[in-house]
Amino acid sequence: MSSRKKIAILVDLELNDQSGGHVKFWERISQSLVKKKLNIDLVFFFLGKKKKTIKVSENINFHIYKPGFSSSNLSFLGIDADITDLSPINLGLLFELRHYNLIHTTDQLHCMAKTAKLASRIWKTPLTTSYHTDTPSYTEYYILEILKKLPNFLDKLFIKKLRIHKRIS
């Protein structure tokens, strides 16, 4: 095993040609470091259609994990946000993270972040996070859009009376 420190950066979104700004941001960060002499190993974790590793440079890799329950499964409801994993935990990732000296999550709410919190507690690995998206506001928006598709009486009950979209977000 390398004596270099290993840092895991968990993006928790699908890496594909249609990926949005959050994924592009981390791709650009990795590309800006390609020609640098790093004394650390950086591994960026993304989601994808199948599990694989993409070697970006000597010290930079992309590990692609297949989501347990992809948010793309909900596209029939009109959810068109970037694809994430809605599973509660990713066991493969949990055991992979024991090999890292630092774990960094780029969200706090989805599968990779939840898995990172657990891994940090189990293996006493430092955990940092950065906040890039106002996920609660997005959640409220999408829940409201889904509820509007219900029959009128349920729409009124869930939105106007119970305000479900406010409670879930």
Language-model-derived ranges and their functions:
Residues S71-S75, T129-I168:
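Acceptor-binding helix/loop patch of EC 2.4 sugar-transfer enzymes
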Residues K50-K51, C111-K114:
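Short, well-ordered alpha-helical microsegments
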Residues E96, I168-S169:
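Structural alpha-helical scaffold elements that stabilize or flank donor/cofactor-binding regions
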Residues L93-M112, W123-S130:
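Short N-terminal targeting/anchoring amphipathic segment
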Residues M1-I60, R98:
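N-terminal subdomain of nucleotide-sugar transferases
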Residues E58-H63, I122, L144-K149:
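Short, hinge-like loop/turn segments at secondary-structure boundaries
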Residues T115-A119:
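A short acidic, amphipathic alpha-helical/loop segment
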Residues R4, L42-L102:
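A conserved catalytic-core segment of Leloir-type glycosyltransferases
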